[in-house]
């Protein structure tokens, strides 16, 4: 191999190195955007005759990190309210609402959801049924 070949390779590598050095010094660095705060969420559960489901669902809901978990189960006939209290263990983030009978023209679940929405304090209202099992971090993914 001739000296011209090695000189050409050396010159090529030198130019590539200088281009890399120029790019490192001349191009601006991108800064990560500050992440906006996540909105507060209220998990709302209209429950009627859902005592067995609440025993499984409520602990998973409480682990989601919501501002509050509201359960409306006042008109149930199977001890839904008592099951909710036992499953929750009475944490401050969980409230049980008794509810009122629906006025004329309202159906049961619509009226229950309306009452829950009136009591909720979160910026985002997330309605869920008592038989839905939430995976860890599901609420965080929903709010992103």
Residue ranges of each PLM-predicted region?
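N-terminal membrane-anchoring/stem segments of glycan-assembly enzymes
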Residues: 1-37
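Active-site beta-to-alpha loop of glycosyltransferases that engages the nucleotide-sugar donor
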Residues: 45-59, 75
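Acidic donor-binding/catalytic loop of UDP-sugar-dependent glycosyltransferases
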Residues: 78-79, 129-144
């Amino acid at each position: 191999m001739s000296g011209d070949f090695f000189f050409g390779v050396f010159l090529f590598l030198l130019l590539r190195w200088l281009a890399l050095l120029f790019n490192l010094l001349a191009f601006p660095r991108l800064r990560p955007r500050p992440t906006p705060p996540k909105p507060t969420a209220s998990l709302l559960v209209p429950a009627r005759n859902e005592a067995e489901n609440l025993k499984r669902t409520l602990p998973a809901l409480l682990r989601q990190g919501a501002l509050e978990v509201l359960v409306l189960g006042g008109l149930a006939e199977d001890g839904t309210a008592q099951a909710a209290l036992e499953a929750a263990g009475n944490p401050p983030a969980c409230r049980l609402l008794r509810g009122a009978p629906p006025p004329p023209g309202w159906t049961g679940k619509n009226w229950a959801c309306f009452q829950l929405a009136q009591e909720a304090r979160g910026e985002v209202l997330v309605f869920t049924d008592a038989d839905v099992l939430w995976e860890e971090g599901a609420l965080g993914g929903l709010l992103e």
